[in-house]
A protein has these predicted regions:
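Donor-binding/catalytic cores of nucleotide-activated saccharide
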Residues: 72, 76, 93-207, 212-230
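Short, well-formed alpha-helical segments that are part of the catalytic scaffolds
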Residues: 14-27
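Membrane-interface aromatic/basic loop that binds lipid-linked glycans or pyrophosphate carriers
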Residues: 278-361
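Cell-envelope/extracellular polymer assembly enzymes that use nucleotide-activated donors
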Residues: 3-6, 35, 192
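Short beta-strand/loop segment that forms part of the nucleotide-sugar
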Residues: 33-42, 63-68, 93
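A conserved acidic beta->alpha catalytic loop
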Residues: 24, 40-49, 68-70
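Short aromatic/hydrophobic "clamp" motif used to bind/position activated sugar donors
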Residues: 88
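Glycine-rich, basic loop-to-helix element that forms the pyrophosphate-binding segment
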Residues: 67-83
Length: 361
């Protein structure tokens, strides 16, 4: 492999934002060591033209794959087999890397050989403010930066419940050795990127670098609650794909520590689907028959694979009323008055958290 890092950039109708994304990568100190792989997923705007213009300017650092639309997972599947980097990372085309952090990251990768590398990332809001995400608990950062850890040793201490796509970099050969592929034709498959390789990875390194800049300002993103409400079918399909992967994996190859972590991860994923139905989507879009159907599937999965127990408490951690238990007893969501009260408490607790906890840092 002739590059240190391949960066897969799934692109669909991102003509206006793709230049910012690419400009953040093609900087002195990183340029010669990266491969920016723009995968044009059947864009109907000028995204392909933009990508090709960068390829002409930076032929040694930019590659372009043009393909029919197949949704997010298909872009990963198209890029992974031909990636030249020792390591590989995904960068959505409406997001970007902090350029100075990228150079530092590349310098660190020169002396790293672990299957996973974890960095910080920032969520960038519409007003330009940023919130950095680190793998810490109540302000404690339990891992020594730059040190190689056995992944089981990290998972055993319980600090980490899941990994997020924005913070993950994988060793490319590890993904190829496990035959990694993402589901095509549906959204939210970045969940697979942060889940499946954890079954296989042996070791991990944490770096004190705020690399990925996650753009939360753009309208229409798939994580917007209103968009999720309209895409419940795809959220459900993605959950079923996760369960299919679990059922087909040789679990006997996993240590008890790894298996316990994976089971807890899956429990949290099922809880997230319940949360979408019972807490997130607007009441006028809620269909009780759909909830009954998915409840039967998830209950069966919990019994079959030993997931759970699943409890669904409000995010504010003040009101301790289990929405899933209420559903099983009443076959309905919380009363309207309680949902409104819960929302009020959520707002108050968020305000207090920002005013007190964050300002004390």
């Amino acid at each position: 492999m002739s590059k240190l890092l391949s960066i897969i950039i799934p692109t669909y109708n991102m003509e206006q934002l793709l230049p910012r994304c690419l400009d953040s990568l093609l900087v002195k100190g990183a340029l010669d060591r990266i491969e920016a792989m723009v995968v044009n997923d059947g864009s109907k705007d000028g995204s392909l033209t933009v990508a090709n213009s960068y390829k002409e300017r930076f032929p040694e650092s930019v590659t372009v794959i043009d393909k029919p639309n197949g949704n997010y997972g298909s872009t990963i599947n198209a890029a992974l087999p031909v990636a030249q980097g020792k390591y590989i990372k995904v960068l959505d085309s409406d997001d970007w890397f902090d350029s100075e952090s990228l150079v530092r990251f590349m310098d660190c990768l020169e002396s790293i050989d672990t299957d996973m590398v974890i960095t910080h990332f920032s969520t960038v809001f519409e007003d330009g403010s940023k919130e950095i995400t680190k793998y810490n608990v109540y302000g404690k950062e339990p891992y020594e930066y730059g040190r190689a850890y056995d992944l089981d040793d990290v998972l055993e201490d319980g600090y980490i419940r899941f990994f997020l796509m924005h913070g993950i970099t994988y060793r490319t050969q590890m993904l190829r050795d496990m035959g990694y592929r993402q589901t095509e034709g549906i959204s939210y498959t970045d969940t697979e990127w942060s889940c499946y390789p954890v079954f296989r990875a042996k070791d991990i390194t944490f770096l004190d670098i705020d690399l990925y800049q996650y753009n939360l300002a753009r309208e229409g993103q798939t994580m917007d609650p209103k968009v999720i409400a309209r895409s419940l079918g795809q959220v459900e399909k993605m959950t079923m794909q996760l369960l299919e992967f679990y059922s087909g994996y040789d679990l006997s190859s996993l240590s008890k520590i790894r298996l316990d972590f994976v089971k807890q991860y899956y429990t949290n994923r099922l809880r997230l689907l319940y949360k979408t139905y019972l807490l997130d989507i607007p009441r006028d879009m809620f269909v009780a028959d759909d909830m009954n159907r998915i409840d039967l599937k998830l209950t069966e999965a919990c019994q079959k694979y030993g997931f759970g127990p699943i409890k669904l408490y409000p995010a504010n951690k003040i009101l301790r009323f289990d929405a899933l238990r209420y559903w099983h007893r009443k076959h309905s969501r919380w009363p309207v008055w309680f949902e409104k009260f819960n929302h009020f408490v959520d707002v108050v607790m968020t305000w207090l958290f920002v005013r007190i906890f964050k300002k004390s840092k």
